[in-house]
């Protein structure tokens, strides 16, 4: 293994928004590791890694073991052996590890290899990356069983805890982040790499705050979490150093969550507040804004203008200027706008510039809502910082901006404080007892290294530490009664910043949830840009839905049935006993009476709630669609036929009992909440009881709407699981006409809403989107439209091939013909192809048929199977120029693979919504032309999104293959083809398409 000569910066490997002092801390670790002495953690260490035939602990076996003895950072001895697993090594494993059957043919058996390893290790401390995996495979047979007695340190735990702001904690990424030897994913190479980063990880732990290290060291005994020994030894070292420096013995470092959080906001780390003349205030939001002139916007997009000066390779784009001026016009005239701007227009800067200038000049605020986190991060961490810098240099003003997501994206300090008090416990995950200690440690370290960033990038296993135990909801939040309210609180501290920001960036979910919460979640904002707007209708419908979630019902039921104070607020309240019986006998008697009454109501509710949620699953038998029989999860339209069924009648009866219990619970708990008002020392538990009231009331209202009423404004659906042991049922009431709701809740409260996307129109027609979003129905909802083509030459760079001789999807021989075509197409193009399926079963059947032929030709094909990491597939696809991918919905949009990585996209079947989809069924009953009014336009938009995966830069080129014959045989085929970004469309046979792919010349005529 060779050292990488190229210097890499830690900055490139940390998550966006990481505080500068934390980046500096990370950057110093390599130097610290060179000179430090870590005592027993640095002596008699054996670093180990294994390779196996797979990840199944029961079925798979070892193929290689590598270990190196490490003394103060120096490798003194090696142990490396192949292992004969007694079974063939799967091809995908061989590709990953570069270990083949021929390598292991004459190697020792697993027992023999582990015996040799045990002799090599002796009594040394073992270090491994994801140690539980390696420990299992080397100790599961008699040869290595004795190694269970050794101390095992998990370097992955160390990395996640000490370096929580890194984007990834994979060994290869740690190697790159700290400029260590490059791993080749063989066990011996990985061991050498881990040897190089091990002391850096120890340095990272040593650099953590002393009190936090000490707290982590006491989270769990060594038997439950052996890696905790590292924190115990380093805590002892830190105490010794503190003793030496102070001259007095340091017994311990008491941990304070509040003090740790305050430390993050010391004066040195405080961001500059928005200047007084530009900071929005409550009154300014209702006043007209002052916007720049159109000429000023046009000048800004010239090569020497505000935007042009931001980029070294800036090229003026007419479409970008037109869009910016249209956004300006919409804002300055208080009208709404719908704009489709093709790929390459630069639409985000086209709306950010007029937004920023208007907000700065008016002391007001403009909001931006995105569908994906990728675009949100691009705006907040790339484009707005650039814009802020250039506006400041030009003397325009100090632009302030804040990104804000929902409550569930941020840790709740109050709940985290409960976790700190309770400590770690063992929990069962898929049959194994696992300690919560490493998850709690990583969470606390992340909080210490974070100002207000969300925890979406934090690598926590929420089966071990449930997300609801870390985050709060708008209902649960104590607000001003919380001891952490103010700057220490992630949500309210960030919201306070948002109130004084010129630009507020959020996601579609919170944007529409704020409507449902009547403006409680976001600061008042009268001007909005909704980007990626093609997904806005569906997100609005999800946000405004009324739900009965079985998992939430069961969770509340279990809380109220629990006998421990940690989970049951009534038990906790009774044990806290705020009333002194001796001095306040009457009040004390009333308190205990009300508490017992509420607790009794809670126990009764628990039984009825569990029964009700359990019987939701009875509705599975109402699904008469044969095609759904092999699916684990189904979605059922609750129509009149279902409502008159025996199963629904039974469920309604259980629902009636549930409602009666819920009403009694609400009444008893409400009395208790009222009694506790003004009582000292019970604010947190009072809020917990109030949350029970709010949750139960919400369930009551949902139950009444879904079970007892049929409101024509809603479509009713049931999401069901066929697995008896799985609690995943959810009854929903979804608004049919979301546009009418938006007309009443959004447009009346805003001056202007701009909807933008690369895919909104069907052909050149915005009618479907306007209707879906309720635009143009009233004076407040009036809207203009703007269609802008791509700044890229799609006609030149994208060739569209429409197959004419493939059977239609419902005809005999379709799948076999498709499989043969896909095999030939991949061979002709030499890989680099993305095939986008609408059906998992068809995708997996095609993969099984196509993959063997491609393997013989030396081409890799991967498939988005159950349990496969989407991120892993994306990363793998981008790294391997010839890799091809079979994928589902998550790859139809938001997946960028510029350059030669992606040369072809195949769409085997048009993405029409399932005819059994509850919304489609309801629309079909109400509208005889529902398919053409709703299903067809949505499918067109999805195809446009998929086509956009192919051309992501000026120099990209490739071929889009539409393998659905209905584009030729059905009248609606013209609607799809007219809507594509490229007009270079050729109808051809499969053989002609294969020849075109083989030539690989985009735009060449088919002979």
Where in the sequence are the language-model features?
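A substrate-engagement module of RecA-like helicase motors
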Residues: 271-287, 294-298, 303-308, 370-502, ...
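Conserved RecA-like P-loop NTPase helicase motor core
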Residues: 791, 799, 803-813, 865-968
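Conserved non-catalytic scaffold segment of RNase H-like nuclease domains
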Residues: 2-151, 164-185
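Conserved pre-motif I regulatory segment
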Residues: 291-338
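Acidic two-metal-ion nuclease catalytic site recognized across multiple nuclease folds
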Residues: 2-37, 199-296
């Amino acid at each position: 293994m060779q050292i990488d000569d190229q210097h890499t910066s830690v900055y490139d490997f940390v998550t966006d928004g990481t505080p500068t002092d934390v980046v500096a801390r990370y950057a110093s670790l390599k130097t610290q590791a060179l000179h430090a002495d870590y005592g027993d953690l640095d002596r008699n260490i054996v670093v180990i890694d294994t390779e196996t035939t797979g990840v199944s602990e029961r079925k798979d076996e070892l193929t290689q073991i590598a270990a190196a003895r490490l003394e103060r950072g120096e490798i003194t001895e090696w142990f490396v052996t192949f292992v004969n697993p007694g079974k063939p090594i799967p091809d995908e494993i061989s590709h990953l590890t570069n270990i083949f059957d021929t390598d292991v043919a004459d190697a020792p058996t697993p027992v023999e290899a582990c015996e040799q390893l045990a002799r090599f290790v002796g009594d040394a401390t073992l270090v491994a990356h994801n140690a539980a995996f390696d420990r299992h495979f080397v100790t599961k047979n008699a040869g290595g069983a004795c190694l269970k007695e050794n101390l095992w340190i998990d370097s992955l735990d160390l990395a996640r805890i000490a370096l929580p702001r890194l984007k990834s904690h994979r060994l290869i990424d740690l190697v790159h982040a700290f400029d260590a030897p490059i791993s080749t994913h063989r066990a011996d190479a990985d061991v050498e790499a881990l040897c190089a980063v091990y002391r850096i990880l120890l340095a990272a732990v040593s650099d953590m705050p002393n009190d936090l290290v000490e707290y982590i060291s006491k989270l769990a005994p060594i038997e439950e979490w052996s890696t905790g020994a590292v924190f115990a030894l380093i805590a002892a070292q830190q105490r010794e150093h503190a003793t030496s420096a102070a001259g007095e013995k340091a017994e311990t470092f008491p941990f304070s969550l509040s003090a740790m959080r305050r430390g993050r906001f010391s004066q040195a780390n405080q961001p500059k507040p928005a200047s007084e003349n530009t900071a929005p205030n409550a009154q300014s939001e209702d006043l007209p804004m002052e916007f720049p002139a159109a000429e000023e916007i046009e000048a800004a997009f010239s090569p020497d203008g505000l935007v042009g000066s931001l980029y070294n390779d800036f090229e003026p784009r007419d479409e970008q200027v037109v869009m910016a001026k249209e956004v300006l016009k919409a804002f300055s005239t208080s009208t709404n706008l719908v704009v489709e701007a093709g790929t390459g227009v630069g639409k985000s800067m086209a709306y950010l510039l007029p937004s920023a200038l208007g907000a700065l000049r008016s002391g007001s605020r403009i909001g931006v809502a995105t569908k994906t986190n990728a675009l949100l991060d691009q705006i907040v961490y790339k484009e707005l910082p650039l814009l802020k810098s250039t506006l400041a240099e030009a003397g325009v003003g100090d632009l302030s901006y804040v990104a804000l997501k929902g409550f569930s994206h941020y840790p709740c300090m109050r709940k985290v404080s409960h976790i700190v008090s309770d400590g770690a416990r063992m929990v069962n995950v898929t049959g194994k007892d696992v300690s919560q200690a490493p998850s709690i440690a990583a969470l606390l370290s992340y909080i210490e290294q974070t100002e207000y960033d969300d925890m979406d990038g934090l690598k926590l296993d929420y089966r071990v530490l449930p997300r609801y135990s870390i985050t709060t909801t708008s209902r649960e939040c104590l607000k001003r009664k919380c001891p952490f309210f103010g700057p220490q609180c992630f949500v309210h501290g960030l919201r306070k910043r948002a109130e004084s920001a010129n630009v507020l960036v959020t996601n579609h979910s919170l944007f529409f949830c704020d409507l449902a919460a009547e403006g409680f979640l976001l600061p008042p904002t009268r001007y909005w840009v909704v980007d990626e707007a093609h997904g806005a209708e569906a997100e609005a419908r999800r946000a405004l839905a009324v739900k009965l979630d079985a998992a939430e019902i069961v969770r509340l039921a279990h809380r109220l049935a629990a006998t421990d104070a940690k989970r049951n607020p009534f038990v906790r309240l009774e044990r806290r006993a705020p009333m002194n019986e001796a001095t306040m006998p009457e009040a004390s008697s009333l308190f205990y009476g009300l508490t017992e009454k509420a607790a009794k109501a809670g126990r009764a509710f628990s039984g009825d709630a569990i029964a009700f949620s359990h019987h939701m699953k009875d509705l599975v038998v109402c699904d008469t669609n044969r095609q759904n029989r092999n699916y684990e999860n189904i979605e059922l339209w609750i129509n009149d036929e279902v409502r008159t069924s025996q199963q629904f009648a039974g469920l309604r009866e259980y629902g009636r009992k549930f409602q009666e219990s819920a009403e009694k619970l609400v009444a008893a708990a409400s009395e208790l909440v009222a009694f506790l008002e003004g009582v000292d020392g019970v604010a947190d538990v009072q809020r917990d009881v109030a949350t029970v009231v709010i949750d139960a009331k919400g369930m009551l209202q949902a139950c009444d709407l879904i079970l007892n009423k049929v409101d024509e404004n809603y479509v009713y659906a049931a999401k069901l699981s066929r697995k008896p042991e799985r609690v995943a049922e959810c009854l929903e009431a979804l608004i049919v006409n979301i546009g009418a709701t938006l007309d009443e809740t959004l447009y009346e409260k805003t001056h202007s809403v701009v909807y933008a996307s690369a895919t909104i129109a069907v052909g050149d027609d915005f009618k479907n989107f306007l209707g879906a979003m309720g635009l143009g129905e009233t004076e407040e909802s009036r809207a203009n439209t703007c269609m802008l083509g791509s700044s890229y030459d799609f006609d030149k760079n994208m060739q569209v091939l429409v197959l004419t001789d493939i059977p239609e999807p419902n005809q005999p021989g379709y799948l076999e013909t498709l499989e043969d075509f896909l095999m030939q197409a991949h061979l002709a193009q030499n890989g680099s192809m993305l095939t986008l399926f609408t059906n998992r079963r068809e995708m997996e059947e095609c993969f099984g048929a196509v993959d063997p032929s491609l393997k013989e030709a030396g081409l890799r094909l991967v498939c988005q199977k159950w349990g496969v990491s989407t991120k892993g597939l994306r990363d793998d696809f981008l790294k391997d120029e010839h890799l091809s991918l079979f994928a589902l919905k998550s790859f139809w949009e938001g997946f960028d693979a510029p350059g030669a990585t992606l040369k072809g996209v195949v769409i085997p079947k048009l993405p029409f919504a399932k005819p059994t989809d509850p919304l489609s069924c309801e629309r079909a009953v109400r509208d005889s032309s529902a398919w053409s009014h709703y299903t067809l336009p949505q499918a067109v938009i999805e195809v446009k999104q998929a086509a956009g995966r192919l051309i992501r830069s000026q120099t990209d080129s490739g071929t889009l293959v539409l393998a659905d014959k209905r584009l030729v045989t059905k009248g609606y085929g013209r609607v799809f083809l007219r809507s594509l970004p490229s007009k270079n469309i050729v109808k051809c046979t499969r053989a002609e398409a294969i020849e075109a792919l083989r030539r690989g010349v985009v735009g060449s005529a088919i002979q």
